[in-house]
Amino acid sequence: MAAHGGSAASSALKGLIQQFTTITGASESVGKHMLEACNNNLEMAVTMFLDGGGIAEEPSTSSASVSTVRPHTEEEVRAPIPQKQEILVEPEPLFGAPKRRRPARSIFDGFRDFQTETIRQEQELRNGGAIDKKLTTLADLFRPPIDLMHKGSFETAKECGQMQNKWLMINIQNVQDFACQCLNRDVWSNEAVKNIIREHFIFWQVYHDSEEGQRYIQFYKLGDFPYVSILDPRTGQKLVEWHQLDVSSFLDQVTGFLGEHGQLDGLSSSPPKKCARSESLIDASEDSQLEAAIRASLQETHFDSTQTKQDSRSDEESESELFSGSEEFISVCGSDEEEEVENLAKSRKSPHKDLGHRKEENRRPLTEPPVRTDPGTATNHQGLPAVDSEILEMPPEKADGVVEGIDVNGPKAQLMLRYPDGKREQITLPEQAKLLALVKHVQSKGYPNERFELLTNFPRRKLSHLDYDITLQEAGLCPQETVFVQERN
């Protein structure tokens, strides 16, 4: 049985040697040697023989010679490795095995096959711009959307979005997450998606382990993949963020975004606007305090410069000027002060001015006092310019009713009233006047005490909670204060 098995193996070996010699034209001894080196694998022996140039040394009959040749033949077994390398550098990679890709050295070329792209560009030039849409390799299936991507940094992408008036769409890719690869394969390759991105967005794709990707992840606190977001290129504000997307959901989400925010053209497509915030009396108190302080300072300076002239006036003129503030100079100043009063009025322009009937109504008591004046004084009085209607004075006839029994020549309290409609009014009352006088004055302006309350901001106090019989001085409203009129809660 052993002899029969040995003869069968010998005949099989002879058959292989005969086939080897027939294919290669080598001698039987060379064929036997190559088959022994390749463990009787005819295909490998023929390949190794041809790779070696078709030349093989005759094996020696001595055992020592065989032992020296065998290590050499063992090295020859490694010959197929260059064959694999040869496929990797095949000049036509579309017909070879996929290439082992080099590490990404750029923020956008992690999956790019530059050689394939060069061939594609040459084909496009030869075909007059036509693109071969047949995907022949796995690399083509998962290739990034090179034609859509902005090839630059995050900052250059924002600048490009500002110049082209387009939103900035960010795609962070994680090569370890297959869902991210599916975005390249399914979503970014869709023609409808490409069209809407080209029209409205600057598309910036970056890999999570790149320098730019790490910086973006650290700043915008990214946690889940796949990741797609839309930013305002002018401010860098993240407007929306999506994770699980297919073609239909992407188109729905983007359509909804554009319907809400529009195009970035500065008109209907302006970025998400800040909520229009109604002007609050308390929020504006700091500005009003500053204005009141400046106005009071100007009035005090002006009062000192004209006190000498006022002393020479008649008693009747003095009585008509007891409650005058910033406008007392309108009724008594000559032409020397007209320019200064006019400049002061022009410098206090406000967006809330009411130049209608109320302006004339509030100015009337000041322009028609029952006083005796000489012709020169009357001329000056009638020729004075109009003053800001928002800085008003309590008319003397009204003041007489609320300050009976009080020394009207004593110290005054200058109050700036801020109404809910944005209008301002400055009044002057004696320090010993009751708080009730102020409440009645506000009621006369159409703000009843049942619905509206008075308060100050620094310190914050609700005057409506105080005793109305206390004086303005006791209420802490002297020498000047800003009082806000607001609706009760």
Curated annotation (Swiss-Prot):
What InterPro entries does UniProt report for this protein, alphabetically? Thioredoxin-like_sf (IPR036249), UAS (IPR006577), UBA-like_sf (IPR009060), UBA_8 (IPR054109), Ubiquitin-like_domsf (IPR029071), UBX_7/2 (IPR017346), UBX_dom (IPR001012), UBX_domain-protein (IPR050730)
Domain (UBA) spans 2-54
GO biological process annotations for this chain's record?
Answer: proteasome-mediated ubiquitin-dependent protein catabolic process
Q: Where in the cell is it found?
A: Nucleus
Give residues where Phosphoserine occurs: S278, S280, S285, S288
Q: What is its main location?
A: nucleus
Explain what the record says happens when changing P459G.
Answer: Abolishes interaction with VCP/p97
- First and last residue of the signal peptide: none
Q: Which GO terms describe its cellular component?
A: cytosol; nucleoplasm; nucleus; VCP-NPL4-UFD1 AAA ATPase complex
- SUPFAM superfamilies cross-referenced by the UniProt entry: Thioredoxin-like (SSF52833), UBA-like (SSF46934), Ubiquitin-like (SSF54236)
Which keywords appear in this protein's UniProt record, sorted alphabetically?
Answer: Acetylation, Isopeptide bond, Nucleus, Phosphoprotein, Ubl conjugation
Listed GO MF terms: RNA polymerase II-specific DNA-binding transcription factor binding; ubiquitin binding; ubiquitin protein ligase binding
| Cross-link position per record: Glycyl lysine isopeptide (Lys-Gly) (interchain with G-Cter in SUMO2) | K84, K134
Indicate the cross-link positions, Glycyl lysine isopeptide (Lys-Gly) (interchain with G-Cter in ubiquitin): K99
Q: Where is the composition biased (Polar residues)?
A: 59-70, 300-309
Q: Which parts of the sequence belong to the UIM domain?
A: 285-304
The residue stretches assigned to a coiled coil in this entry are: none
Looking at the record, which segments are called Disordered?
56-77, 300-384
Q: Where is the composition biased (Basic and acidic residues)?
A: 352-366
Q: Give all N-acetylalanine modified positions.
A: A2
Q: List the disulfide bonds.
A: none
Q: What does this protein do?
A: Ubiquitin-binding adapter that links a subset of NEDD8-associated cullin ring ligases (CRLs) to the segregase VCP/p97, to regulate turnover of their ubiquitination substrates.
Q: What is known of its domains?
A: The UIM (ubiquitin-interacting motif) is required to engage the NEDD8 modification on cullins. The UBX domain mediates interaction with VCP/p97.
Summarize the subunit comment.
Answer: Interacts with neddylated CUL2, ubiquitinated HIF1A, and VCP/p97.
PANTHER family hit by this protein: FAS-ASSOCIATED PROTEIN, UBX DOMAIN-CONTAINING PROTEIN 7
Q: What is this protein called?
A: UBX domain-containing protein 7
